[in-house]
Amino acid sequence: MNELTLIDFYLCFLAFLLFLVLIMLLIFWFSLEIQDIEEPCNKV
């Protein structure tokens, strides 16, 4: 039982880390999009 609970805890921890990374990537992409919108369109 201890091994199963350890594996479950490890999987939950990995899922939590993946969730945090996804949120950070979304915030980073969103900030880049806002900067592109605020700046005048020089890239044509």
UniProtKB/Swiss-Prot annotation:
GO cellular component: host cell membrane; membrane
Membrane-spanning parts: 9-29
Native species: Bat coronavirus HKU3 (BtCoV)
A Pfam family the protein falls into: bCoV_NS7B
CDD domains: ORF7b_SARS-CoV-like
Main location class: host cell
Domain of life: Viruses
Keyword terms of this UniProt record: Host membrane, Membrane, Transmembrane, Transmembrane helix
Protein name per Swiss-Prot or TrEMBL: Non-structural protein 7b
Membrane association type: Single-pass membrane protein
Note: Bat coronavirus HKU3 is highly similar to SARS-CoV (SARS-like).
